[in-house]
Design a protein with these regions (language model features):
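Short, conserved catalytic/metal-binding micro-motifs enriched in Asp/Glu and His
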Residues: 35-43, 57, 84, 88-96, ...
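Amphipathic alpha-helical
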Residues: 22, 159-198
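Conserved, non-catalytic sequence blocks in retroelement Pol enzymes and Pol-derived host proteins
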Residues: 2, 44-53, 68-78, 96-106, ...
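Hydrophobic alpha-helix feature that most strongly marks membrane-spanning transmembrane helices
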Residues: 40, 62, 66-69, 84, ...
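C-terminal helix/juxtamembrane-tail motif
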Residues: 220-246
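Short, conserved micro-motifs composed of acidic
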Residues: 2-32
Length: 246
């Protein structure tokens, strides 16, 4: 099969722009590329991807606002769950540990949608979440993360997940057994903020009655009611200006 250099793309985690020659064609490195529906940038910040998600979700919130007066409450709720929050449910494990700035953008869209649904323009975001009996997008993504870890635990995860989250074999059993291997890291963005590093810590926060489940469906039902507390990621940590994360 003859190669088509026009379809070649080069993405490097490097500040400098590089060029390579293939079949006398020059391929320049790009700042971001879309792969399987996820826009990956050279800094692995996923800012481009999340901004695109926010733009699409915001457009649908605007459409909902225009038509809200013509819809019933159930119809407005259906629009939220089917066409707005679903934008943030595709491949969340890849991009979920993004910046606080991006998390605020997502929450702002979610908050505005809830205000339109409940016609409530006085309550706080947390009060709206309580009224809706729903978590934030980030909290829902944390639920999905621990669900994937549970699949690994019971042997129902795809092989690639077993490569990312390696099982730690122990000669004895502990009540709070850590079955996902913890890695030593040296950096923040590609180390302590990586999903492979944070996953075991987040698993520790899961209630014991959920961990002790043996059935995936039963685990999913229980984990829906779990609101993560004291999550160790940068999004959830308290930040004090001129001091840093606490």
């Amino acid at each position: 099969m003859k190669m088509n250099p026009d379809k070649f793309h080069l993405l490097l985690s490097n500040r400098k722009e590089l060029k390579i020659n293939i079949c006398n064609e020059t391929i320049s490195s790009s700042k971001h590329e879309k792969l399987l529906g996820v826009t990956i940038d050279s800094k692995l910040s996923f800012e481009e991807h999340i901004n695109n998600l926010c733009k699409k979700a915001s457009q649908k919130v605007n459409a909902l606002a225009r038509l809200a007066s013509l819809m019933s409450f159930d119809q407005r709720k259906l629009i939220l769950n089917s066409f707005i929050t679903t934008h943030f449910s595709y491949c969340p494990l890849v991009w979920m540990f993004h910046s606080r700035h991006l998390n605020n953008k997502i929450n702002a869209i979610h908050e505005r949608a809830l205000r339109i649904i409940y016609q409530d323009y006085k309550s706080s975001f947390q009060e709206l979440l309580n009224k809706d009996n729903s978590p934030t997008v980030h909290q829902r993504n944390l639920q999905k993360l621990v669900t994937e870890l549970f699949k690994i635990k019971i042997g129902e995860a795809p092989e690639i997940m077993n490569e990312i989250f390696q099982i730690e074999e122990r000669p004895y059993n502990l009540r709070n057994e850590v079955f996902v291997k913890r890695h030593n890291v040296r950096t923040v963005r590609y180390g302590t903020e990586a999903v492979s590093f944070l996953a075991p810590k987040i698993w520790d926060l899961v209630p014991e009655d959920c961990k002790n489940e043996t059935d995936l469906i039963a685990f999913k039902e229980k984990i829906k009611n779990w609101i993560p507390d004291s999550c160790p990621c940068r999004i959830c940590k308290k930040y004090v200006q001129n001091l840093g994360f606490l």
